[in-house]
């Protein structure tokens, strides 16, 4: 994958527009989770150190295009950046017809989704973005799977279009895990439905040695193997699909599970052997023996890809499976990469972020890359690098 990298460019005195993913949760006008901002800070600091006039843009939420809405304003992000960098970071609302920024200065543009034509990737808007800068830097891996004005269109028209350090690191880590992984490789794919992760499961079945499934996905595989799943969430119409995947790659199944009679925070958890699951049971986690078996598989792996918690870890009585696997990944010497919103929440809960080799900032983009799909914002950077 050949793209021009921001780190290789001379940015002294250049006007640099950086597209970051600053789509963070905001509560009562204050940033509630700063993970994405923290991930973007090194790129912004580097551009300033290189003597650039820095303009940063991002989306936040899903406002009605062409209309300002206070709840989707990036004002809380500008406030956060000002504190984090110890300098004034002005939020600029009207920037499409030009903005004054000097070398060593930093401004944040208001939500790009307030601009008409952003989501449709309109050329007219993309050309206005491009006219603002000497160098466009795409650093938002989380939106790289969307062809929009500020992620794809601008890269077509900017004088120079490059990948930022965060985007480059994501691509390197994912390439390492998927293109030529150190073997044996284990993947953990969990979620409520096989249908939403079908492409991921198919793609991984051809590169990994062990495909560990969890959540509703595991229930469909259990049903495919003839095991009782009670009233658990599963997809009867995808049982044959599960059988086909299990014929291609080793899919270790739970030998014991944690069940309850209802899906609730107060539900009583009971450990049962898989054969003993009753008709009115709901499977809400893997059992302790299964967790130990899976942890053993992870211990002998050289590459681990993790997408999705294996139980309803938000309720502590159904969190042990995810906790044991999180610790096993943390203790492993393997190259490990984790991605997806729920996965990141589990990593936070069990305090293993420092032990995982690479944590992806992109949810949908992470999955699409794993599926083997082309990410439009990356493809345009490759095209520009060739030219």
UniProtKB/Swiss-Prot annotation:
Keywords: ATP-binding, Cytoplasm, Glycolysis, Kinase, Nucleotide-binding, Transferase
Record-listed ATP binding positions: 197, 314, 340-343
One GO BP: gluconeogenesis
Record bears the keyword DNA damage: no
Residues that, per the record, bind substrate: 21-23, 36, 59-62, 113, 146
GO molecular function: ADP binding; ATP binding; phosphoglycerate kinase activity
GO cellular component terms listed in the entry, alphabetical order: cytosol
EC number per UniProt: 2.7.2.3
PROSITE patterns, sorted: PGLYCERATE_KINASE (PS00111)
Catalytic function, reaction form: (2R)-3-phosphoglycerate + ATP = (2R)-3-phospho-glyceroyl phosphate + ADP
Keyword field contains ATP-binding: yes
Gene3D superfamilies, sorted: Phosphoglycerate kinase, N-terminal domain
Pfam families attached to this UniProt entry: PGK
Enzyme class: transferase
Pathway(s) served: Carbohydrate degradation; glycolysis; pyruvate from D-glyceraldehyde 3-phosphate: step 2/5
Chief localisation class: cytoplasm
Similarity remark: Belongs to the phosphoglycerate kinase family.
Name of the protein in its database record: Phosphoglycerate kinase
High-level lineage: Bacteria, Pseudomonadati, Pseudomonadota, Gammaproteobacteria, Pseudomonadales
Gene (name only): pgk
């Amino acid at each position: 994958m050949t793209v021009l990298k921001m780190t290789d460019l001379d940015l002294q005195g250049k006007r640099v527009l950086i597209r970051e993913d600053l789509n963070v949760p905001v509560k009562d006008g204050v940033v509630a989770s700063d993970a994405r901002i923290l991930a973007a800070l090194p790129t912004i600091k580097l551009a300033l150190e290189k003597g650039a006039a820095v303009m940063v843009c991002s989306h936040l939420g899903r406002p009605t295009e062409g209309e300002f809405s206070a709840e989707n304003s990036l004002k809380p992000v500008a406030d956060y950046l000002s504190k984090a960098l110890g300098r004034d970071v002005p939020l600029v609302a009207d920037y499409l017809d030009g903005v004054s920024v000097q070398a060593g200065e930093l401004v944040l543009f208001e939500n790009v989704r307030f601009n008409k034509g952003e989501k449709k990737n309109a050329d007219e808007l993309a050309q206005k973005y491009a006219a603002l800068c000497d160098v466009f830097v795409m650093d938002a891996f989380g939106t790289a799977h969307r062809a929009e004005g500020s992620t794809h269109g601008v890269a077509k028209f900017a004088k120079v279009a490059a990948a930022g350090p965060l985007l480059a690191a994501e691509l390197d880590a994912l390439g390492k895990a998927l293109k030529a992984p150190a073997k044996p490789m284990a993947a953990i794919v969990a979620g409520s439905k096989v249908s939403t992760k079908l492409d991921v499961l198919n793609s991984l079945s051809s590169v990994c040695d062990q495909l560990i499934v969890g959540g509703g996905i595991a229930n469909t595989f259990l049903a495919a193997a003839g095991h009782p799943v009670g009233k658990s969430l599963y997809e009867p119409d995808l049982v044959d699909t599960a059988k086909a995947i299990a014929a291609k790659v080793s899919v270790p199944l739970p030998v014991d599970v944690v069940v309850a009679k209802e899906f609730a925070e107060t539900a009583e958890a009971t450990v049962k052997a898989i054969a003993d699951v009753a008709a009115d049971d709901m499977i809400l986690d893997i059992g302790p023996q299964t967790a130990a078996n899976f942890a053993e598989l992870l211990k002998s792996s050289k590459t681990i890809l993790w997408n999705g918690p294996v139980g309803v870890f938000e309720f502590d009585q159904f969190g042990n499976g995810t906790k044991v696997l999180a610790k096993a990944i943390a203790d492993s010497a393997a190259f490990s990469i984790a991605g997806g919103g729920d996965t990141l929440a589990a990593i936070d809960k069990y305090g293993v972020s420092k032990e995982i080799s690479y944590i992806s900032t992109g949810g949908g983009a992470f999955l699409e890359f794993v599926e083997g799909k082309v990410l439009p914002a990356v493809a345009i950077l490759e095209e520009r690098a060739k030219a």
